[in-house]
Amino acid sequence: MFSVARTAIRGAARPAVRIARRGYAETASVDKLRLTLALPHQSIYNQKEVTQVNIPSTAGELGILANHVPTIQQLKPGVVEVIETNGETKSYFISGGFATVQPDSELSVNSIEAFQAEDFSPEAIKSLTAEAQKNAQSADEAVAAEAEIELEVLEALAHFAK
């Protein structure tokens, strides 16, 4: 009696699984990645087709292409590199944020701020790094913790602004 019920359940479940797979594969047939790079005050990219986007995730550096597996990633301070369909590469320094890849080859990158390399002065970065290193040695735990965060951001920024 139970084996008949199991067989009936398996038989009923199979078509649903096939339909779900078939629907997902049809949705993911897009050739280009659509990027939205949004800040609270502006959208740098709004549903623009691009070839690839490299993001600084807390899990490591990720290269996102069309048909990438859906994911949500927390971003650390670093460089978002956008390779456009014409082959041109644009880079933006972000202080952190989140990236979401949807099943339909859509990538949303949300950050508080994003800047291009020419927006930074290497001298100012060195000066701020020296000040943050001094503050990291502070006896005040709050000041030291804040300085450690500043150092992480400034280190990533120094590599970007070279």
Swiss-Prot record:
Tell me the residues of the organelle transit peptide: 1-24
**Does the keyword field hold Aminoacyl-tRNA synthetase?**
no
A GO molecular function assigned to this protein is: proton-transporting ATP synthase activity, rotational mechanism
Q: Where in the cell is it found?
A: Mitochondrion inner membrane
Give me the Gene Ontology terms describing cellular component: mitochondrial inner membrane; proton-transporting ATP synthase complex
Q: What superkingdom heads the lineage?
A: Eukaryota
Per the record's keyword annotation, is Transcription included, yes or no? no
**Major location, coarse class?**
mitochondrion
* GO biological process terms on file: proton motive force-driven ATP synthesis
Q: Which Pfam families match?
A: ATP-synt_DE_N, ATPD_C_fung
Membrane topology recorded in Swiss-Prot or TrEMBL: Peripheral membrane protein
Which UniProt keywords are present, listed alphabetically? ATP synthesis, CF(1), Hydrogen ion transport, Ion transport, Membrane, Mitochondrion, Mitochondrion inner membrane, Transit peptide, Transport
State the disulfide connectivity. Answer: none
What function is annotated for this protein?
Mitochondrial membrane ATP synthase (F(1)F(0) ATP synthase or Complex V) produces ATP from ADP in the presence of a proton gradient across the membrane which is generated by electron transport complexes of the respiratory chain. F-type ATP synthases consist of two structural domains, F(1) - containing the extramembraneous catalytic core, and F(0) - containing the membrane proton channel, linked together by a central stalk and a peripheral stalk.
Regarding protein family, the annotation reads: Belongs to the ATPase epsilon chain family.
Q: Tell me the subunit arrangement.
A: F-type ATP synthases have 2 components, the catalytic core F(1) and the membrane-embedded component F(0), linked together by a central stalk and a peripheral stalk. The central stalk, also called rotor shaft, is often seen as part of F(1). The peripheral stalk is seen as part of F(0). F(0) contains the membrane channel next to the rotor. F-type ATP synthases form dimers but each monomer functions independently in ATP generation.
Q: What is this protein called?
A: ATP synthase subunit delta, mitochondrial
Which organism is this entry from? Yarrowia lipolytica (strain CLIB 122 / E 150)
What is the gene called?
ATP16
